[in-house]
Amino acid sequence: MPDLPGSSPERDAWMFQQSIHNSLLQFDDVKIYPTAICQSSDSNLIITSTIAEWYKEGSYKPYSEVDLSLLMNVLKEYKTNIQPWVRIQRLVRDIPSKSIEAGYQKYSNLRQMLHDEMKKEGKVCQCIRCMEIDDLGDNNISPTLVVRSYPASYGTEYFISYEWYPTFSWLFSLYLYFFYWSGDNSRKAIIGFCRLRIDKNPGGGFINELKNCGLIRELHVYGSSLQIGKNGSSSQHKGYGQKLMIVAEDIMKSYGLKKSAVIAGVGTREYYKNKCGYYLEGTYMVKELKQSYMYIWVILIFVILLI
């Protein structure tokens, strides 16, 4: 929430940098709400706002009211450098401009203004919302498997995704398949992703079904859904979800983990059961992991060829 009383463009820029680089602040989603001073909707003034009182007294004035570009520059810097595993859910509260007394000069379409400026400057936001693909349809494209890992809250997170790039060679594809290259931020569109967490004490160490487990926290494939039993070309029905799950399970095996656990809602349990081989244990969908030593042979063959 930038532009709060006592803050400044420099402090807000530091705050956003912390959210990018601090391992304790690696959230999945974020809502950015620049400070807005709103009129009270209560005629008896039972609902009061200290910030509104400070504004009327003259002891506080949002810096965006003095110069909107100060706030815009802070937001552009964050959107340009945001980690690709974060999704900006909202930017600016959905408040009618007539209800705003002060703050970002009452522009309720600030997000659109921000994107227009970034487009003119040749800047691109790397967040999931700005990169997610609507639907592949029948387009004949070959998405790239990208695996990113990062420390988060005393554990390791993996952001596994299928992304579309303009060029892609078969040799590079082979390298990706066996070694899970980490990729870069030059992607064009994200088709789907899986969030995997590796933790020394999954579930805090007191949930029996999570012992020695890797945790799949989220699986999401973009595109339109179809009725059960119907065929179609939607990206949700091209098997990307299953492929992402296989990669996540391979990573768990490399840590020597025995089980995979999915935080799955009631409506998605059948998918994990029928498509991925999971079963219900407690409140989690779990799967026993069978160790495969094929990757050792691949590495040995690769070394022999190099020699």
Predicted features, each with a name:
Residues 1-53, 69-97, 215-216:
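Conserved C-terminal portion of the radical SAM core fold
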Residues 44, 52-65, 234:
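Glycine-rich tight-turn/loop motif centered on a GG-T
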Residues 86-214, 220-222, 226-228, 255, ...:
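Non-catalytic substrate-recognition and accessory regions of acyl/acetyltransferase enzymes
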Residues 232-252:
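Conserved acetyl-CoA-binding loop-helix of GNAT-fold acetyltransferases
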Residues 250-264:
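Conserved GNAT acetyl-CoA-binding A-motif
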Residues 264-284:
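Conserved active-site alpha-helix within GNAT-family acetyltransferase domains
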Residues 286-292:
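Short beta-strand-to-coil "C-cap" segments at the C-terminal boundary of structured domains/repeats
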Residues 293-307:
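Terminal signal-anchor or tail-anchor transmembrane helices
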